[in-house]
Amino acid sequence: MEESAIRKAAAQMMELHGNGAELAAASKADAMLNQGNIDGFYAWNRISAAINDLDRKAV
């Protein structure tokens, strides 16, 4: 997944989930791992990290 797609997904998650966006992304990463979807796991971990980064920049 390209960085621009990661950032877009992070912004969408923040819009949908507000302060719970990072937790929601982490939950999706866990679900991907439980399903054996390693690529999905890494993608959602990157989205979670991007949410954290955007949160820090917003402060």
Where are these regions (language model features)?
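Amphipathic, hydrophobic secondary-structure cores in small proteins
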Residues: 14-50, 54
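N-terminal acidic leader/helix
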Residues: 1-20
